[in-house]
């Protein structure tokens, strides 16, 4: 797995025509390149499971309990802390490469009025984070979850835990 982070993201995007807002230097905005060996395209939802649960693990380590809001968000306390965007390149019936875009609100405390319900780690924990130190920690959490893709038992465990952490927000 490889990561490419942006200290300043100028054209962040989300699902559909949504954009991602991040003040330069305050948040983690990065993409992961993953080459899941032997993952069938029909099982590509497991890549969402991998990323979302890895991010959830990271947040739990920071004392933040979070859940998954389908299709691609991580929420805590009724507010959005992270967004995901996953694009897969297929080769036949298999996922050859996956690019997982992550936008995690880390130190941001001021938000544009048009953003609905954003929250950051700093707002929740009253602690400032060095994003350069936090990125490898978060990547290790996601990488550990990606390792579960290698076996049928790991894939089943990912799916079950993912399903158990879906938020039902009305």
Language-model region placement:
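N-terminal lobe of the biotin/lipoate ligase/transferase fold
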Residues: 1-61, 82, 128
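Short beta-strand segments
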Residues: 5-7, 31-33, 69, 85-87, ...
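Short, glycine/acidic-enriched loop or turn micro-motifs at the edges of active sites
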Residues: 10-11, 15, 76, 104-106
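Acidic (Asp/Glu) carboxylate-rich active-site/surface patches
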Residues: 51-93, 103
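Short, acidic (Asp/Glu-rich) active-site segment that either coordinates a divalent metal cofactor
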Residues: 93-125, 131
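Conserved, helical-rich catalytic subdomain that frames metal- and/or nucleotide-binding sites
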Residues: 124-170
């Amino acid at each position: 797995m490889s990561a490419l982070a942006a200290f300043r993201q100028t054209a962040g995007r989300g699902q559909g025509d949504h954009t991602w807002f991040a003040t330069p230097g305050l948040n983690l905005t990065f993409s992961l390149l993953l080459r899941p060996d032997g993952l069938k395209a029909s099982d590509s939802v497991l890549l969402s499971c991998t990323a979302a649960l890895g991010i959830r693990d990271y947040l739990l380590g920071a004392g933040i309990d979070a859940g998954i809001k389908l299709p691609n968000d991580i929420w805590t306390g009724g507010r959005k802390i992270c967004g995901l965007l996953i694009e897969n390149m297929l080769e036949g019936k298999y996922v050859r490469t996956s690019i997982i875009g992550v936008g995690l609100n880390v130190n941001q405390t001021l938000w544009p009025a048009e953003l609905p319900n954003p929250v950051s780690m700093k707002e929740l924990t009253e602690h400032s984070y060095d994003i350069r130190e936090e990125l490898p920690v978060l990547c290790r959490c996601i990488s550990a979850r990606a390792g579960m893709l290698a076996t049928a038992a790991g894939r089943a465990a990912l799916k079950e835990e993912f399903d158990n952490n879906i938020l039902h927000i009305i």
